[in-house]
Amino acid sequence: VKYVTPLSLDETSDYYGKPATWQHGLDLRDLYRTGVTNTTNVSFSKSVKDFNTRVSFTNSYRTGVQPNSDAIRRFLGFKTNFKPTPWMNVSLDYKYTYRQDHNAAESGYNGSRTVLQEYTQWGQTNVNLKDYKDYKRPDGSWRTWNINSVNNQSAAFHDNPYALFHEYNHRTIYQWNVFSGDVSVDLPYNLKAGVRVNGNIRGYKLERERPSGSINFRSN
């Protein structure tokens, strides 16, 4: 059994004028890929009389299972102890954390970015998603499997999943600065006096790039 697909009605598509066979074609594995993580660690330490220090840095980059998604993690640590005088001890500790998530996978029923939800609940099992990887027409509009009509080939309900993956960008950036300092003084009779300072500075940034041609963001 052959049937006319939205792509066969699209003059800009390689499938124009080519009916498709009515068969199961909705393979959600076509939407995803294997994620890869690359981690680098560097550390340095030095210890001599009345002084020791250590510096470490870790950088981790991970590609997500969704196209156009990734994550970055960076950790910096610095710790040192020294005795400026025989009766004084100084300790300094600093930690920095950077975390960025780009297009992290989302769940829930929001109808705007959860591609998996749209295509498991509302997808048509005869749609071959691989045919829609070339989602953009020369004029910038998107091809989709649920058009309004023959003369109006814009999305009626759901956007092309590949368009959502590549045209929508959502970034969250977290930064933490944690530091502490100790100064202690040796007193007679095995007593000690000192002061300790602690600090914690945090930062958060959210960025969203929403495509203007998306039906899913018209009311958002």
Residue ranges and their predicted role:
Residues V1-L7, T97-N151, R208-R210, N216-S219:
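A surface-exposed, glycine/aromatic-enriched loop/edge motif typical of exported proteins
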Residues V1-N68, A105-G108, K136-N152, L164-H170, ...:
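Residues embedded in well-ordered regular secondary structure
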Residues K2, K18, K46-K49, K79, ...:
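Context-gated lysine
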Residues V65-F75, K95-G108, Y168-N177, D182-N220:
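Small-side-chain secondary-structure face that scaffolds active or pore-lining regions
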Residues R29-A104, V115, W122, W176-S180:
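Transmembrane beta-barrel wall of Gram-negative outer-membrane proteins
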